[in-house]
Amino acid sequence: MAQRTRLGDILRPLNSEYGKVAPGWGTTPVMGVFMLLFFVFLLIILQIYNSSLVLDTFKVDWRSLGL
């Protein structure tokens, strides 16, 4: 038999929904939107890394940051 601990008693409410599934699609469309946004973010980072996204109009200078 499992031993009851104080930490287990604190975490038990987080597991109270175990086995219950929301009917329908639930939050799947929201997850899809965030996955798409994350993919676009990674694509932009990859293009900057490969220099295929030209950023010549942005001048980066440490003095412009006021440091």
Curated annotation (Swiss-Prot):
GO BP annotations, alphabetical order: photosynthesis; protein stabilization
Subcellular location: Cellular thylakoid membrane
Alphabetical list of PANTHER family matching this protein: PHOTOSYSTEM II REACTION CENTER PROTEIN H
Protein name listed in UniProt: Photosystem II reaction center protein H
Signal peptide segment: none
Molecular function terms from GO: phosphate ion binding
Family: Belongs to the PsbH family.
InterPro entries in the record: PSII_PsbH, PSII_PsbH_sf
Task of the protein: One of the components of the core complex of photosystem II (PSII), required for its stability and/or assembly. PSII is a light-driven water:plastoquinone oxidoreductase that uses light energy to abstract electrons from H(2)O, generating O(2) and a proton gradient subsequently used for ATP formation. It consists of a core antenna complex that captures photons, and an electron transfer chain that converts photonic excitation into a charge separation.
Gene Ontology CC entries for this record: photosystem II; plasma membrane-derived thylakoid membrane
Subunit field text: PSII is composed of 1 copy each of membrane proteins PsbA, PsbB, PsbC, PsbD, PsbE, PsbF, PsbH, PsbI, PsbJ, PsbK, PsbL, PsbM, PsbT, PsbX, PsbY, PsbZ, Psb30/Ycf12, peripheral proteins PsbO, CyanoQ (PsbQ), PsbU, PsbV and a large number of cofactors. It forms dimeric complexes.
Lipid bilayer topology: Single-pass membrane protein
Main location: membrane
Organism of origin: Synechococcus elongatus (strain ATCC 33912 / PCC 7942 / FACHB-805)
Transmembrane segments: 29-49
Keywords: Membrane, Photosynthesis, Photosystem II, Thylakoid, Transmembrane, Transmembrane helix
